[in-house]
Amino acid sequence: YASRPIPAMQGLDRGERVIYVGTFSRTVAPSIRMAYLILPPALLEVYRAKFGHAAATVSRLEQEALRRFLASGAYSRHLRRVGNLYRRRRDALVSRLEPWGEVRGAEAGLHLLFTLPGREEKELVAQAARAGYRVRGLGEYCLKARPIPGTLVLGFAGLAEEKAEEAIAENRDFLDA
């Protein structure tokens, strides 16, 4: 959100070895159960030989509707719209969190790291849960490295801009502790 997207891996790949696997469930709607696989030309025939017999479980009608959605440019417009929406949500949350701690990793993605200096991660997670928020501590994502103490992983995709101020106001005691 803070800069232009990084180039696609396929565009950087000189040996045609990049494979893309994804789904439209997160970018369009959870009910769309369609995935995609983009293979380099050299692997396409191997894939067809090994897996060509597997029948698609998605109806042709749904596939055609998605094909038209993609071909019309509507999907690209949708991604731009939601990107702008997520940027506004991120900005609203970051501006309200910065007075209490350090925000990291907000440049891209739908999560950020929020550090409250001098606080214990487990207690922060427990306090957030008591206040009705589902958050995780950074330590849950670390196998060997020691996480930054007092750091929460906060998602903002589902946080409406106007709710950011409300959430901070409701939790001033938690933030000030």
Indicate residue ranges for each PLM-predicted region.
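Short helix-loop capping/hinge motifs at secondary-structure junctions, enriched
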Residues: 15, 41-46, 76
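Structural signature of PLP-dependent enzymes
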Residues: 47-54, 70-94
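PLP-dependent enzyme catalytic core of the Aspartate aminotransferase-like
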Residues: 130, 146-177
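Short hydrophobic/aromatic beta-strand micro-patches
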Residues: 38, 113-117, 155-157
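Conserved glycine-rich beta-strand-loop-beta hairpin in the small C-terminal domain of fold type I
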Residues: 67, 83-94, 102-115, 127
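Active-site pre-lysine segment of PLP-dependent enzymes
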Residues: 1-27
